[in-house]
Curated annotation (Swiss-Prot):
Name of this chain's protein: Tryptophan--tRNA ligase
GO biological process: tryptophanyl-tRNA aminoacylation
InterPro entries assigned to the protein according to its UniProt record, in alphabetical order: aa-tRNA-synth_I_CS, aa-tRNA-synth_Ic, Rossmann-like_a/b/a_fold, Trp-tRNA-ligase, Trp-tRNA-ligase_bac-type, Trp-tRNA_synthetase
Subcellular location: Cytoplasm
Species, as recorded: Klebsiella aerogenes (Enterobacter aerogenes)
Gene: trpS
Described purpose of this protein according to its UniProt entry: Catalyzes the attachment of tryptophan to tRNA(Trp).
Gene Ontology MF term list: ATP binding; tryptophan-tRNA ligase activity
Motif range ('HIGH' region): 12-20
Record's GO cellular component terms: cytosol
Binding locations of ATP: Q11, P12, S13, G19, N20, G147, E148, D149, V186, K195, M196, S197, K198, S199
Primary residence: cytoplasm
Length: 334
């Protein structure tokens, strides 16, 4: 029986955070035995906002080394860089012609990013969800792990696939969202009602995977809790968002359940909780960074992983693009 195909990707813009790791990357690693996993570094999406060319090259290799350090195995998964497989852009253009202006106008992420990058509201930013649809549909993907911020884009990908199939027959698999059994939703350290984001301008909200562990300890010790007297370490997302966030992080790193942690911290101060979170997270990062530097310093190996990954991805992508071009009525290249 063939394994279901899973596609996911991350932009090489901005350093990945413990939120990316606990909420996504760790799930990706765990899926490798049961799914045919295709993981992409989406550098073409990254240029919808201005990038420094040297920094983009560096960030792409950094992201690849981080994927590997987190446990993504090129023997089990297809790992590649988006711009190395031209079929993504080619299918993206074709799908543009089956996507309506009004649909793209309704995308909330476009509205958010337009406000944030008001000086550079480019067509690529508007059209981003169509390229994302191409990324997914190229590989006849069965399931896509998505966070809240990308659910709307996956819905659009499904709509485009169904619209195209209604005209031309079953060319595309219609992808389903993959909802992991468990995946920590890591919140901002100082504003625990909003998600930790690698693009947050206030770096005290964020813990980067490549950050100095000493700086991480300081940030966690400054994290928001609450002013209850006496302090009570209890999981309550509504009333105690900061404490709940720290418990979620500690649970994700140690594998202990929330009830076990609540019992452990009964009668203890918030300082005890912060101390244990800081110790657990910094210990995890020291191990991860050691693996990261080993991969990052071996560019020959990274180049081989990218080359092999692009070849594997292209073999699958070219079949889908050929079927699409044939369905549309393009003359085959002699």
């Amino acid at each position: 029986m063939t394994k279901p195909i899973v596609f996911s990707g991350a932009q090489p813009s901005g350093e990945l955070t413990i939120g990316n790791y606990m909420g996504a990357l760790r799930q990706w690693v765990n899926m490798q035995d049961d799914y045919h996993c295709i993981y992409c570094i989406v550098d073409q999406h990254a240029i919808t906002v201005r990038q420094d060319p040297q920094q983009l090259r560096k960030a792409t290799l950094d992201t690849l080394a981080l994927y590997l350090a987190c446990g993504i195995d090129p023997q089990k998964s297809t790992i590649f860089v988006q711009s190395h497989v031209p079929e993504h852009a080619q299918l993206g253009w074709a799908l543009n012609c089956y996507t309506y202006f009004g649909e793209l106008s309704r995308m909330t992420q476009f509205k958010d990013k337009s406000a944030r990058y008001a000086e550079n509201i480019n067509a690529g930013l508007f059209d981003y969800p169509v390229l994302m649809a191409a990324d997914i549909l190229l590989y006849q993907t069965n399931q896509v792990p998505v966070g809240e911020d990308q659910k709307q884009h996956l819905e659009l990908s499904r709509d485009i696939a169904q619209r195209f199939n209604a005209i031309y027959g079953d060319i595309f698999k219609v992808p389903e969202p993959f909802i992991p059994k468990s995946g920590a939703r890591v919140m901002s350290l100082l504003e625990p009602t909003k998600k930790m984001s690698k693009s947050d301008d206030n770096r005290n909200n964020v813990i980067g995977l490549l950050e100095d562990p000493k700086s991480v300890v300081k940030k966690i010790k400054r994290a928001v809790t609450d002013s209850d007297e006496p302090p009570v370490v209890r999981y309550d997302l509504k009333e105690k968002a900061g404490v709940s966030n720290l418990l979620d992080i500690l649970s994700a790193v140690t594998g202990k359940t929330i009830p076990e942690l609540e019992q452990h911290f009964e009668g203890k101060m918030y300082g005890h909780l912060k101390g244990e979170v800081a110790e657990a997270v910094s210990g995890m990062l020291i191990d991860l960074q050691e693996r990261y530097h080993r991969f990052r310093n071996d560019e020959a190996f990274l180049n081989q992983v990218m080359k092999d990954g692009a070849e594997k991805a292209s073999a699958r992508a070219s079949q889908t693009l050929k079927a699409v071009y044939e369905a549309i009525g393009f003359v085959a290249k002699p």
